[in-house]
C-alpha cells in the first residue's frame, strides 16, 4: 500500500514518536529505540510472528493500536484520503429459456439426436409456432356434432339408448366443446332439463338447424382425387420444392472446387462445432480437401434432412452469395432437364 512506501520518511517517524512512545508500540521489547525503525522496515512481519515477545492480550492491544495508527497515517500523509465503497449485492434473476439457447448464427439448437434436432428446429421461435393455425387441434363444430346430428334425424331411426349423447364421456366433452365454440351454451333459457342427455339433445337440434346440410360440406371421393392430382402437378412445377432435395456427390465436388479457402467462413453457418473445425484443419493442409470434408461433415450431421435449400441459405448468410447463386442455377438446370425427360 501507499503508506508502506512512505514509512521510512523522517516526517512519519517524528510523528510516531510524538503520537505514542516506543514502549507502547512494542511492549516488553526491552530493546533500543532503533527497534522501531527495524520493525517498520520489515512491515512488522518478524515482530508480529514472534510469540515469545508478545502475550495474547498485548498482541490484541498492539493490533488495535496499529490499526488506529494506520488510519491516522493515511489521513495525515496521503494526498487523497481513502474512500470506501459499499459492497453491492448481486441481484438474483430468474433464469429465462433464452439464457440457455444456443447463440449461433442461425440459432439452430443441436439436441443430440437427429430426429429431435429436426423437430425442435422446425420453427425458430417455439412460442410463435404454438400460435400457428396448424397447431389448432380442436375439431370444427360441424365435424364434432356430425354423428350426433345424424342420430337425431328421425329418418335414420336410431334408438335413444344407442345415441352418442347417452355416453357420459362424450357428454362431458360436448359440454366443454360447446363452452368454447357455441354461443348457445351461455344464452339463458326458460326450458328446464332433468339431466344432461335432454340438454344435449336440445342443443343438437338447434345446431342441426343452423349448420349447413351434410351433403354440402362433404366432398366426393372423385373431387378429392382430382385435388390430390392437381396438388402433385403444382408440386412438381414449384421451383422451391425442386430445391428441397438432398445434395448429390456431384454437387459437393462442384461446390468444393469453388469454395476452396472460404470453407472456414461457411463453417459456423453450417452449425459445425469448433472441435470438428479443428479436426478438419488437422485432416489435411489442402484447402479443397478441407472444404470437401466440411460439406461431408455437414451432410452427416443433418442426415436425411440435409437439402440444397438449407445449404443455399447458409451460403447467403455467410456472405458467399455468388456461390449460392451458382448452386441455385445448377439446381434449376438439373430440374429443367429432368422435367424434359418426363414430358
Swiss-Prot record:
Localization: Nucleus; Nucleus, Nucleoplasm; Nucleus matrix; Cytoplasm, Cytosol
List of residues that carry Phosphoserine: 215, 238
Region listing for Disordered, in residue ranges: 211-244
Position(s), cross-link Glycyl lysine isopeptide (Lys-Gly) (interchain with G-Cter in SUMO1): 273
SUPFAM superfamilies listed in its UniProt record: DEATH domain
Residues recorded with modification Phosphothreonine: 220
Modified residues (N6-acetyllysine): 8
InterPro entries per record: DEATH-like_dom_sf, Death_dom, THO_THOC1
Transmembrane segments: none
Death domain boundaries: 248-331
Positions of crosslink type Glycyl lysine isopeptide (Lys-Gly) (interchain with G-Cter in SUMO2): 86, 258, 273
Entry keyword annotation includes rRNA-binding: no
Post-translational modification: Expression is altered specifically during apoptosis and is accompanied by the appearance of novel forms with smaller apparent molecular mass. Polyubiquitinated, leading to proteasomal degradation; probably involves NEDD4.
GO terms of biological process kind: apoptotic process; mRNA export from nucleus; mRNA processing; RNA splicing; signal transduction
Entry's Gene Ontology molecular function annotations: DNA binding; RNA binding
Subunit structure: Component of the THO subcomplex, which is composed of THOC1, THOC2, THOC3, THOC5, THOC6 and THOC7. The THO subcomplex interacts with DDX39B to form the THO-DDX39B complex which multimerizes into a 28-subunit tetrameric assembly. Component of the transcription/export (TREX) complex at least composed of ALYREF/THOC4, DDX39B, SARNP/CIP29, CHTOP and the THO subcomplex; in the complex interacts with THOC2, THOC5 and THOC7. TREX seems to have a dynamic structure involving ATP-dependent remodeling. Binds to the hypophosphorylated form of RB1. Interacts with RNA polymerase II. Interacts with LUZP4.
Function: Component of the THO subcomplex of the TREX complex which is thought to couple mRNA transcription, processing and nuclear export, and which specifically associates with spliced mRNA and not with unspliced pre-mRNA. Required for efficient export of polyadenylated RNA. The THOC1-THOC2-THOC3 core complex alone is sufficient to bind export factor NXF1-NXT1 and promote ATPase activity of DDX39B. Participates in an apoptotic pathway which is characterized by activation of caspase-6, increases in the expression of BAK1 and BCL2L1 and activation of NF-kappa-B. This pathway does not require p53/TP53, nor does the presence of p53/TP53 affect the efficiency of cell killing. Activates a G2/M cell cycle checkpoint prior to the onset of apoptosis. Apoptosis is inhibited by association with RB1. Essential for early embryonic development. Required for normal gene expression during postnatal testis development. May play a role in hair cell formation, hence may be involved in hearing.
Entry similarity comment: Belongs to the THOC1 family.
Annotated protein name in UniProt: THO complex subunit 1
Amino acid at each position: 500500500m501507499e503508506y508502506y512506501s512512505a514509512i521510512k520518511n523522517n516526517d512519519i517517524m517524528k510523528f510516531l514518536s510524538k503520537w505514542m512512545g516506543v514502549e507502547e508500540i512494542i511492549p516488553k521489547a526491552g530493546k533500543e529505540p532503533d527497534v522501531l525503525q527495524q520493525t517498520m522496515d520489515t512491515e512488522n512481519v518478524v515482530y508480529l510472528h514472534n510469540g515469545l515477545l508478545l502475550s495474547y492480550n498485548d498482541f490484541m492491544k498492539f493490533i488495535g493500536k496499529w490499526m488506529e495508527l494506520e488510519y491516522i497515517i493515511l489521513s495525515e500523509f496521503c494526498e487523497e484520503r481513502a474512500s470506501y465503497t459499499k459492497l453491492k449485492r448481486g441481484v438474483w434473476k430468474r433464469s429465462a429459456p433464452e439464457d440457455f439457447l444456443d447463440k449461433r448464427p442461425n440459432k439452430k439448437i443441436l439436441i443430440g439426436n437427429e430426429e429431435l434436432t429436426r423437430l425442435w428446429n422446425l420453427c425458430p421461435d417455439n412460442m410463435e409456432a404454438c400460435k400457428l393455425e396448424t397447431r389448432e387441434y380442436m375439431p370444427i363444430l360441424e365435424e364434432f356434432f356430425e354423428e350426433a346430428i345424424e342420430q337425431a334425424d328421425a329418418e335414420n331411426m336410431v334408438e335413444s339408448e344407442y345415441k352418442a349423447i347417452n355416453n357420459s364421456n362424450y357428454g362431458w366433452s360436448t359440454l366443454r366443446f360447446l363452452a368454447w365454440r357455441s354461443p348457445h351454451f351461455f344464452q339463458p333459457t326458460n326450458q328446464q332439463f332433468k339431466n344432461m342427455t335432454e340438454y344435449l339433445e336440445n342443443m343438437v337440434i338447434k345446431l342441426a338447424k343452423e349448420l349447413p346440410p351434410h351433403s354440402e360440406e362433404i366432398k366426393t371421393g372423385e373431387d378429392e382425387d382430382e385435388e390430390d392430382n392437381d396438388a402433385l402437378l403444382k408440386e412438381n412445377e414449384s421451383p422451391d420444392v425442386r430445391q428441397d432435395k438432398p445434395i448429390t456427390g456431384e454437387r459437393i465436388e462442384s461446390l468444393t472446387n469453388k469454395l476452396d479457402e472460404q470453407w472456414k467462413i461457411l463453417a459456423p453457418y453450417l452449425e459445425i462445432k469448433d472441435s470438428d473445425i479443428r479436426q478438419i484443419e488437422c485432416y489435411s493442409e489442402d484447402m479443397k480437401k478441407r472444404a470437401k470434408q466440411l460439406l461431408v461433415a455437414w451432410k452427416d450431421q443433418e442426415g436425411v434432412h440435409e437439402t440444397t435449400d438449407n445449404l443455399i441459405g447458409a451460403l447467403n448468410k455467410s456472405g458467399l452469395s455468388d456461390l449460392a447463386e451458382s448452386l441455385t442455377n445448377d439446381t434449376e438446370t438439373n430440374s429443367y432437364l429432368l422435367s424434359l425427360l418426363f414430358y
